[in-house]
Amino acid sequence: MIDPNLLRSNLDLVAKKLARRKFILNINKFRQQESLRKILQKKTESLQTERKAKAKIIGVAKSRGENVEFLCQEAYVLGKKLTSLKLENKELKNRIKQFELSLPNIPDDQVPYGFRDQDNLEIMRWGKPGQYNFPIRDHVALGALTNGLDFSNATKLTGSRFIVMKGQIAHLHRALSQFMIDLHVKRHGYEEYYLPYLVNQDSLYGAGQLPKFYEDLFHIQHLQSGTNPYALIPTAEVPLINLVRDVILDEEELPIKMVAHTPCFRYEAGSYGHHTRGLIRMHQFDKVEMVQVVHPDKSMQILEEITSHAEQVLQLLKLPYRKILLCTGNIGFSSCKTYDLEVWLPAYNAYCEVSSCSNVGDFQARRIRARYKGRMNRKARLLHTLNASGVAIGRALAAVLENYQLEDGRVAIPSVLSPYMSDITHIN
Protein backbone atom coordinates (compact mmCIF):
# COMPACT_ATOMS: atom_id res chain seq x y z
CA MET A 1 0.00 0.00 0.00
CA ILE A 2 1.27 3.46 -0.89
CA ASP A 3 1.92 5.80 2.03
CA PRO A 4 -1.41 7.63 2.62
CA ASN A 5 0.52 10.71 3.79
CA LEU A 6 2.31 10.82 0.43
CA LEU A 7 -1.02 10.55 -1.35
CA ARG A 8 -2.44 13.48 0.61
CA SER A 9 0.65 15.69 0.42
CA ASN A 10 1.78 15.02 -3.16
CA LEU A 11 -1.07 13.43 -5.08
CA ASP A 12 0.00 14.80 -8.47
CA LEU A 13 3.49 13.28 -8.12
CA VAL A 14 2.04 9.87 -7.18
CA ALA A 15 -0.34 10.04 -10.16
CA LYS A 16 2.57 10.88 -12.47
CA LYS A 17 4.67 7.97 -11.20
CA LEU A 18 1.78 5.49 -11.41
CA ALA A 19 1.09 6.64 -14.97
CA ARG A 20 4.54 5.25 -15.84
CA ARG A 21 3.06 1.79 -15.24
CA LYS A 22 -0.10 2.63 -17.20
CA PHE A 23 -2.22 3.05 -14.10
CA ILE A 24 -4.55 6.05 -14.14
CA LEU A 25 -5.04 7.42 -10.64
CA ASN A 26 -8.47 9.01 -10.22
CA ILE A 27 -7.26 12.27 -8.69
CA ASN A 28 -10.68 13.91 -8.54
CA LYS A 29 -12.23 10.93 -6.74
CA PHE A 30 -9.48 10.87 -4.12
CA ARG A 31 -9.66 14.64 -3.55
CA GLN A 32 -13.44 14.52 -3.21
CA GLN A 33 -13.19 11.70 -0.67
CA GLU A 34 -10.46 13.52 1.25
CA SER A 35 -12.45 16.76 1.26
CA LEU A 36 -15.53 14.96 2.57
CA ARG A 37 -13.41 13.16 5.19
CA LYS A 38 -12.10 16.48 6.51
CA ILE A 39 -15.63 17.95 6.61
CA LEU A 40 -16.99 14.93 8.49
CA GLN A 41 -14.03 14.98 10.86
CA LYS A 42 -14.62 18.67 11.68
CA LYS A 43 -18.34 18.08 12.17
CA THR A 44 -17.60 15.12 14.44
CA GLU A 45 -15.12 17.11 16.52
CA SER A 46 -17.57 20.03 16.75
CA LEU A 47 -20.41 17.76 17.92
CA GLN A 48 -18.14 16.06 20.45
CA THR A 49 -17.17 19.46 21.86
CA GLU A 50 -20.83 20.52 21.96
CA ARG A 51 -21.87 17.29 23.72
CA LYS A 52 -19.13 17.67 26.34
CA ALA A 53 -20.23 21.24 27.00
CA LYS A 54 -23.85 20.11 27.25
CA ALA A 55 -22.86 17.39 29.75
CA LYS A 56 -21.16 20.01 31.95
CA ILE A 57 -24.24 22.24 31.83
CA ILE A 58 -26.44 19.29 32.82
CA GLY A 59 -24.09 18.49 35.69
CA VAL A 60 -24.20 22.05 37.02
CA ALA A 61 -28.00 22.23 36.63
CA LYS A 62 -28.44 18.94 38.51
CA SER A 63 -26.25 20.19 41.36
CA ARG A 64 -28.57 23.19 41.70
CA GLY A 65 -31.64 20.97 41.73
CA GLU A 66 -32.92 22.37 38.45
CA ASN A 67 -35.08 20.47 35.94
CA VAL A 68 -32.73 19.02 33.32
CA GLU A 69 -35.27 17.08 31.24
CA PHE A 70 -35.05 19.47 28.29
CA LEU A 71 -31.23 19.59 28.47
CA CYS A 72 -31.08 15.78 28.54
CA GLN A 73 -33.31 15.64 25.47
CA GLU A 74 -30.91 18.00 23.67
CA ALA A 75 -27.96 15.83 24.75
CA TYR A 76 -29.76 12.72 23.48
CA VAL A 77 -30.32 14.34 20.05
CA LEU A 78 -26.65 15.36 19.94
CA GLY A 79 -25.65 11.77 20.76
CA LYS A 80 -27.81 10.39 17.95
CA LYS A 81 -26.32 12.88 15.48
CA LEU A 82 -22.82 11.99 16.64
CA THR A 83 -23.45 8.24 16.27
CA SER A 84 -24.80 8.76 12.75
CA LEU A 85 -21.86 10.98 11.85
CA LYS A 86 -19.32 8.46 13.19
CA LEU A 87 -20.94 5.70 11.13
CA GLU A 88 -20.83 7.88 8.01
CA ASN A 89 -17.19 8.71 8.74
CA LYS A 90 -16.35 5.02 9.24
CA GLU A 91 -17.97 4.06 5.92
CA LEU A 92 -16.10 6.84 4.12
CA LYS A 93 -12.76 5.80 5.64
CA ASN A 94 -13.43 2.23 4.50
CA ARG A 95 -14.08 3.46 0.93
CA ILE A 96 -10.85 5.48 1.05
CA LYS A 97 -8.94 2.44 2.32
CA GLN A 98 -10.35 0.25 -0.47
CA PHE A 99 -9.31 2.93 -2.94
CA GLU A 100 -5.79 2.98 -1.47
CA LEU A 101 -5.62 -0.85 -1.54
CA SER A 102 -6.42 -0.78 -5.26
CA LEU A 103 -3.31 1.28 -6.05
CA PRO A 104 -0.19 -0.58 -7.26
CA ASN A 105 3.28 0.17 -5.95
CA ILE A 106 5.25 3.12 -7.30
CA PRO A 107 7.99 1.96 -9.72
CA ASP A 108 11.56 2.74 -8.72
CA ASP A 109 13.26 5.40 -10.84
CA GLN A 110 15.74 2.76 -12.11
CA VAL A 111 12.94 0.79 -13.78
CA PRO A 112 12.88 1.34 -17.57
CA TYR A 113 9.74 2.96 -18.94
CA GLY A 114 7.53 0.89 -21.23
CA PHE A 115 4.63 -1.52 -21.55
CA ARG A 116 5.88 -4.19 -23.98
CA ASP A 117 8.33 -7.05 -23.59
CA GLN A 118 10.62 -5.18 -25.98
CA ASP A 119 10.84 -2.41 -23.37
CA ASN A 120 12.37 -4.75 -20.78
CA LEU A 121 16.12 -4.37 -20.37
CA GLU A 122 18.32 -7.44 -20.83
CA ILE A 123 21.06 -7.27 -18.20
CA MET A 124 23.11 -10.37 -19.05
CA ARG A 125 23.14 -13.90 -20.43
CA TRP A 126 24.75 -16.94 -18.85
CA GLY A 127 25.68 -20.11 -20.72
CA LYS A 128 25.34 -20.91 -24.39
CA PRO A 129 22.36 -22.81 -25.81
CA GLY A 130 23.39 -26.32 -26.86
CA GLN A 131 23.75 -27.42 -30.46
CA TYR A 132 21.89 -30.59 -31.46
CA ASN A 133 22.55 -32.69 -34.56
CA PHE A 134 19.14 -34.37 -34.29
CA PRO A 135 15.51 -33.17 -34.28
CA ILE A 136 14.80 -31.54 -30.91
CA ARG A 137 11.87 -32.81 -28.87
CA ASP A 138 9.99 -30.61 -26.43
CA HIS A 139 9.49 -31.68 -22.82
CA VAL A 140 5.97 -32.96 -23.54
CA ALA A 141 7.29 -35.38 -26.16
CA LEU A 142 10.20 -36.39 -23.93
CA GLY A 143 7.80 -36.96 -21.04
CA ALA A 144 5.70 -39.23 -23.26
CA LEU A 145 8.77 -41.17 -24.46
CA THR A 146 9.93 -41.78 -20.90
CA ASN A 147 6.34 -42.47 -19.78
CA GLY A 148 6.68 -39.88 -17.01
CA LEU A 149 4.32 -37.02 -17.92
CA ASP A 150 0.65 -37.97 -18.12
CA PHE A 151 -1.57 -35.06 -19.17
CA SER A 152 -4.40 -37.35 -20.27
CA ASN A 153 -5.04 -38.87 -16.85
CA ALA A 154 -4.62 -35.47 -15.19
CA THR A 155 -7.42 -34.15 -17.41
CA LYS A 156 -9.55 -37.17 -16.47
CA LEU A 157 -8.88 -36.65 -12.76
CA THR A 158 -9.33 -32.89 -12.65
CA GLY A 159 -9.27 -30.99 -15.93
CA SER A 160 -6.90 -29.16 -18.25
CA ARG A 161 -3.65 -27.58 -17.05
CA PHE A 162 -2.92 -30.24 -14.46
CA ILE A 163 -0.29 -32.99 -14.60
CA VAL A 164 0.34 -36.50 -13.32
CA MET A 165 4.04 -37.34 -13.02
CA LYS A 166 5.36 -40.80 -12.36
CA GLY A 167 8.49 -42.90 -12.22
CA GLN A 168 11.82 -41.26 -12.93
CA ILE A 169 10.24 -37.96 -14.01
CA ALA A 170 8.45 -37.67 -10.65
CA HIS A 171 11.77 -38.55 -8.99
CA LEU A 172 13.54 -35.82 -10.98
CA HIS A 173 10.86 -33.30 -10.01
CA ARG A 174 11.39 -34.16 -6.34
CA ALA A 175 15.17 -34.07 -6.74
CA LEU A 176 15.00 -30.54 -8.14
CA SER A 177 13.04 -29.31 -5.13
CA GLN A 178 15.38 -30.99 -2.65
CA PHE A 179 18.43 -29.57 -4.42
CA MET A 180 16.99 -26.04 -4.39
CA ILE A 181 16.01 -26.14 -0.72
CA ASP A 182 19.40 -27.53 0.31
CA LEU A 183 21.19 -24.85 -1.72
CA HIS A 184 19.24 -21.98 -0.20
CA VAL A 185 19.43 -23.32 3.35
CA LYS A 186 23.01 -24.59 3.46
CA ARG A 187 24.76 -22.10 1.18
CA HIS A 188 22.57 -19.00 1.20
CA GLY A 189 21.52 -19.00 4.85
CA TYR A 190 17.73 -19.22 4.62
CA GLU A 191 15.54 -20.94 7.19
CA GLU A 192 13.21 -23.59 5.75
CA TYR A 193 9.47 -23.40 6.46
CA TYR A 194 6.56 -25.79 6.03
CA LEU A 195 3.40 -23.74 5.49
CA PRO A 196 -0.38 -23.99 5.23
CA TYR A 197 -1.59 -24.21 1.64
CA LEU A 198 -4.79 -22.39 2.63
CA VAL A 199 -4.69 -18.78 3.84
CA ASN A 200 -7.31 -16.36 5.11
CA GLN A 201 -8.44 -13.05 3.62
CA ASP A 202 -6.18 -10.97 5.89
CA SER A 203 -3.12 -12.82 4.59
CA LEU A 204 -4.19 -12.27 0.97
CA TYR A 205 -4.76 -8.55 1.56
CA GLY A 206 -1.47 -8.30 3.43
CA ALA A 207 0.56 -9.81 0.59
CA GLY A 208 -1.16 -7.64 -2.03
CA GLN A 209 -3.16 -10.44 -3.66
CA LEU A 210 -6.45 -8.79 -2.74
CA PRO A 211 -8.40 -6.98 -3.95
CA LYS A 212 -6.51 -6.94 -7.28
CA PHE A 213 -6.22 -10.69 -7.99
CA TYR A 214 -9.49 -12.00 -6.56
CA GLU A 215 -10.47 -13.76 -9.80
CA ASP A 216 -7.04 -15.43 -10.18
CA LEU A 217 -7.35 -17.29 -6.87
CA PHE A 218 -8.96 -20.63 -6.04
CA HIS A 219 -11.37 -19.75 -3.21
CA ILE A 220 -12.66 -22.31 -0.71
CA GLN A 221 -16.36 -21.72 -0.08
CA HIS A 222 -17.87 -22.71 3.26
CA LEU A 223 -21.01 -24.72 2.46
CA GLN A 224 -23.12 -23.54 5.39
CA SER A 225 -22.25 -19.84 5.42
CA GLY A 226 -21.57 -19.43 1.70
CA THR A 227 -18.53 -17.31 2.52
CA ASN A 228 -14.98 -17.69 1.19
CA PRO A 229 -12.87 -17.67 4.37
CA TYR A 230 -9.85 -19.29 2.70
CA ALA A 231 -8.06 -19.48 -0.63
CA LEU A 232 -5.35 -21.80 -1.94
CA ILE A 233 -1.99 -20.05 -1.98
CA PRO A 234 -0.84 -18.67 -5.37
CA THR A 235 2.73 -18.60 -4.02
CA ALA A 236 4.50 -19.33 -0.74
CA GLU A 237 5.25 -15.60 -0.59
CA VAL A 238 1.74 -15.06 0.82
CA PRO A 239 2.09 -17.10 4.04
CA LEU A 240 5.80 -16.29 4.43
CA ILE A 241 5.25 -12.52 4.31
CA ASN A 242 2.40 -12.75 6.80
CA LEU A 243 4.62 -14.43 9.39
CA VAL A 244 5.82 -10.91 10.25
CA ARG A 245 2.32 -9.38 10.27
CA ASP A 246 1.83 -7.16 13.36
CA VAL A 247 5.42 -7.88 14.44
CA ILE A 248 8.00 -5.33 15.61
CA LEU A 249 11.54 -6.66 15.18
CA ASP A 250 14.81 -5.39 16.60
CA GLU A 251 17.27 -4.17 13.99
CA GLU A 252 19.74 -6.83 15.17
CA GLU A 253 17.32 -9.54 13.97
CA LEU A 254 17.51 -8.37 10.36
CA PRO A 255 17.56 -9.70 7.74
CA ILE A 256 14.95 -12.43 8.14
CA LYS A 257 15.57 -15.01 5.37
CA MET A 258 12.84 -17.60 4.73
CA VAL A 259 12.43 -20.32 2.11
CA ALA A 260 9.67 -22.83 1.40
CA HIS A 261 8.72 -25.43 -1.19
CA THR A 262 4.97 -25.49 -1.79
CA PRO A 263 2.45 -26.23 -4.49
CA CYS A 264 0.98 -23.05 -5.95
CA PHE A 265 -2.55 -22.67 -7.28
CA ARG A 266 -3.53 -20.09 -9.88
CA TYR A 267 -6.73 -19.89 -11.86
CA GLU A 268 -5.12 -18.07 -14.83
CA ALA A 269 -7.23 -19.88 -17.41
CA GLY A 270 -6.31 -17.59 -20.30
CA SER A 271 -3.84 -18.53 -23.01
CA TYR A 272 -1.90 -15.28 -22.73
CA GLY A 273 1.88 -15.32 -22.64
CA HIS A 274 4.56 -16.73 -24.89
CA HIS A 275 4.43 -20.37 -23.77
CA THR A 276 1.40 -22.33 -22.63
CA ARG A 277 2.13 -25.90 -23.73
CA GLY A 278 3.01 -28.65 -21.29
CA LEU A 279 4.35 -27.66 -17.87
CA ILE A 280 4.74 -23.97 -18.64
CA ARG A 281 1.37 -22.63 -17.46
CA MET A 282 -0.48 -24.82 -14.97
CA HIS A 283 -3.29 -24.34 -12.47
CA GLN A 284 -1.18 -26.26 -9.93
CA PHE A 285 2.61 -26.18 -9.91
CA ASP A 286 5.44 -26.44 -7.38
CA LYS A 287 7.83 -23.64 -6.56
CA VAL A 288 10.62 -22.91 -4.13
CA GLU A 289 10.14 -19.38 -2.84
CA MET A 290 12.61 -17.14 -1.03
CA VAL A 291 11.51 -14.16 1.06
CA GLN A 292 13.68 -11.63 2.86
CA VAL A 293 12.53 -9.06 5.42
CA VAL A 294 15.17 -6.34 5.59
CA HIS A 295 16.25 -2.89 6.75
CA PRO A 296 14.79 -0.28 4.36
CA ASP A 297 18.21 1.15 3.55
CA LYS A 298 19.42 -2.22 2.25
CA SER A 299 16.54 -3.51 0.10
CA MET A 300 18.02 -2.57 -3.29
CA GLN A 301 21.30 -4.24 -2.34
CA ILE A 302 19.40 -7.31 -1.14
CA LEU A 303 17.50 -7.45 -4.45
CA GLU A 304 20.81 -8.12 -6.20
CA GLU A 305 21.66 -10.76 -3.58
CA ILE A 306 18.36 -12.64 -3.68
CA THR A 307 18.43 -12.60 -7.49
CA SER A 308 21.93 -14.10 -7.44
CA HIS A 309 20.61 -16.89 -5.19
CA ALA A 310 18.02 -17.81 -7.84
CA GLU A 311 20.68 -17.53 -10.55
CA GLN A 312 22.90 -20.05 -8.76
CA VAL A 313 20.17 -22.67 -9.12
CA LEU A 314 20.33 -22.33 -12.90
CA GLN A 315 24.11 -22.06 -12.97
CA LEU A 316 24.61 -25.25 -10.95
CA LEU A 317 22.12 -27.02 -13.21
CA LYS A 318 24.13 -25.62 -16.15
CA LEU A 319 21.01 -24.24 -17.79
CA PRO A 320 21.49 -21.24 -20.10
CA TYR A 321 19.46 -18.25 -18.98
CA ARG A 322 19.18 -14.50 -19.24
CA LYS A 323 18.48 -11.82 -16.64
CA ILE A 324 15.86 -9.20 -17.51
CA LEU A 325 15.02 -5.93 -15.75
CA LEU A 326 11.28 -5.54 -16.25
CA CYS A 327 9.84 -2.29 -17.56
CA THR A 328 7.26 -0.21 -15.68
CA GLY A 329 4.31 -1.85 -17.43
CA ASN A 330 5.47 -5.41 -16.68
CA ILE A 331 6.40 -5.30 -13.00
CA GLY A 332 3.97 -6.93 -10.60
CA PHE A 333 1.28 -5.07 -8.66
CA SER A 334 3.27 -5.00 -5.38
CA SER A 335 6.75 -4.58 -6.86
CA CYS A 336 8.82 -1.43 -7.25
CA LYS A 337 11.62 -3.23 -9.15
CA THR A 338 11.76 -6.75 -10.61
CA TYR A 339 14.29 -8.97 -12.34
CA ASP A 340 13.06 -11.96 -14.31
CA LEU A 341 15.30 -14.95 -14.97
CA GLU A 342 14.42 -16.70 -18.22
CA VAL A 343 15.73 -20.19 -18.91
CA TRP A 344 16.53 -21.45 -22.41
CA LEU A 345 14.06 -23.97 -23.89
CA PRO A 346 15.58 -25.50 -27.05
CA ALA A 347 12.28 -26.79 -28.45
CA TYR A 348 10.80 -23.29 -28.32
CA ASN A 349 14.08 -21.73 -29.48
CA ALA A 350 13.34 -19.08 -26.86
CA TYR A 351 13.79 -18.10 -23.23
CA CYS A 352 11.00 -18.72 -20.71
CA GLU A 353 10.53 -17.12 -17.29
CA VAL A 354 11.56 -19.44 -14.47
CA SER A 355 12.06 -16.93 -11.66
CA SER A 356 10.79 -13.50 -10.71
CA CYS A 357 12.80 -11.52 -8.13
CA SER A 358 11.19 -8.40 -6.68
CA ASN A 359 11.85 -5.59 -4.25
CA VAL A 360 8.47 -4.67 -2.78
CA GLY A 361 9.81 -1.85 -0.58
CA ASP A 362 7.43 -0.99 2.27
CA PHE A 363 4.32 -1.75 0.17
CA GLN A 364 3.49 -5.05 1.92
CA ALA A 365 4.94 -4.00 5.27
CA ARG A 366 2.47 -1.11 5.46
CA ARG A 367 -0.42 -3.50 4.83
CA ILE A 368 0.72 -6.01 7.45
CA ARG A 369 2.17 -3.46 9.91
CA ALA A 370 5.62 -5.13 9.87
CA ARG A 371 8.07 -2.84 11.62
CA TYR A 372 11.45 -2.70 13.33
CA LYS A 373 13.17 -0.60 15.98
CA GLY A 374 16.67 0.72 15.39
CA ARG A 375 19.62 0.37 17.74
CA MET A 376 19.61 4.07 18.58
CA ASN A 377 16.23 5.32 17.38
CA ARG A 378 13.64 3.11 19.06
CA LYS A 379 10.74 4.52 17.06
CA ALA A 380 9.10 1.72 15.07
CA ARG A 381 9.65 2.05 11.30
CA LEU A 382 8.32 0.02 8.39
CA LEU A 383 10.43 -2.85 7.08
CA HIS A 384 11.07 -3.68 3.43
CA THR A 385 10.23 -7.08 1.93
CA LEU A 386 11.61 -8.95 -1.07
CA ASN A 387 10.67 -12.20 -2.78
CA ALA A 388 12.20 -14.44 -5.42
CA SER A 389 11.32 -17.75 -7.01
CA GLY A 390 14.17 -20.08 -6.33
CA VAL A 391 12.90 -21.45 -8.78
CA ALA A 392 9.64 -22.69 -10.41
CA ILE A 393 10.16 -26.46 -10.30
CA GLY A 394 7.93 -27.51 -13.20
CA ARG A 395 9.58 -25.07 -15.58
CA ALA A 396 13.03 -26.07 -14.33
CA LEU A 397 12.04 -29.69 -15.00
CA ALA A 398 10.98 -28.77 -18.54
CA ALA A 399 14.31 -26.99 -19.05
CA VAL A 400 16.33 -29.97 -17.79
CA LEU A 401 14.41 -32.39 -20.01
CA GLU A 402 14.91 -30.26 -23.11
CA ASN A 403 18.51 -29.13 -22.53
CA TYR A 404 19.77 -32.56 -21.44
CA GLN A 405 17.95 -34.66 -24.06
CA LEU A 406 19.80 -37.23 -26.16
CA GLU A 407 19.05 -38.41 -29.68
CA ASP A 408 17.58 -41.73 -28.51
CA GLY A 409 15.02 -39.97 -26.27
CA ARG A 410 16.89 -40.49 -23.03
CA VAL A 411 17.62 -37.52 -20.75
CA ALA A 412 20.94 -37.10 -18.96
CA ILE A 413 20.82 -36.18 -15.27
CA PRO A 414 22.65 -32.94 -14.31
CA SER A 415 25.62 -33.90 -12.15
CA VAL A 416 24.49 -31.66 -9.29
CA LEU A 417 21.28 -33.72 -9.01
CA SER A 418 23.05 -37.08 -8.88
CA PRO A 419 22.97 -37.36 -5.04
CA TYR A 420 19.20 -36.79 -5.15
CA MET A 421 18.62 -39.28 -7.99
CA SER A 422 20.13 -42.41 -6.44
CA ASP A 423 23.18 -41.80 -8.66
CA ILE A 424 21.37 -42.76 -11.87
CA THR A 425 22.87 -41.03 -14.90
CA HIS A 426 19.93 -41.02 -17.33
CA ILE A 427 16.16 -41.10 -17.49
CA ASN A 428 15.35 -43.92 -19.88
Swiss-Prot record:
GO terms for biological process: selenocysteine biosynthetic process; seryl-tRNA aminoacylation. The keyword Protein biosynthesis applies. InterPro entries: aa-tRNA-synt_IIb, aa-tRNA-synth_II, aa-tRNA-synth_II/BPL/LPL, Ser-tRNA-ligase_type_1, Ser-tRNA-synth_1_N, SerRS_1_N_sf, SerRS_core, tRNA-bd_arm. The keyword Chloroplast does not apply. It is an enzyme of class 6 (ligase). It comes from the Bacteria. Keywords: Aminoacyl-tRNA synthetase, ATP-binding, Cytoplasm, Ligase, Nucleotide-binding, Protein biosynthesis. L-serine binds at residues 235-237, 289, 389. PROSITE patterns: AA_TRNA_LIGASE_II. One of its GO terms (cellular component) is cytoplasm. It catalyses: tRNA(Ser) + L-serine + ATP = L-seryl-tRNA(Ser) + AMP + diphosphate + H(+); tRNA(Sec) + L-serine + ATP = L-seryl-tRNA(Sec) + AMP + diphosphate + H(+). It is found in: Cytoplasm. Its main location: cytoplasm. Transmembrane segments: none annotated. It holds the Pfam family Seryl_tRNA_N. GO terms for molecular function: ATP binding; serine-tRNA ligase activity. Its EC number is 6.1.1.11. Pathway: Aminoacyl-tRNA biosynthesis; selenocysteinyl-tRNA(Sec) biosynthesis; L-seryl-tRNA(Sec) from L-serine and tRNA(Sec): step 1/1. ATP binds at residues 266-268, 353-356. PANTHER family: SERINE--TRNA LIGASE, SERYL-TRNA SYNTHETASE. Consists of two distinct domains, a catalytic core and a N-terminal extension that is involved in tRNA binding. Belongs to the class-II aminoacyl-tRNA synthetase family. Type-1 seryl-tRNA synthetase subfamily. Homodimer. The tRNA molecule binds across the dimer. Catalyzes the attachment of serine to tRNA(Ser). Is also able to aminoacylate tRNA(Sec) with serine, to form the misacylated tRNA L-seryl-tRNA(Sec), which will be further converted into selenocysteinyl-tRNA(Sec). This is Serine--tRNA ligase. It comes from Blochmanniella pennsylvanica (strain BPEN). The gene is serS.
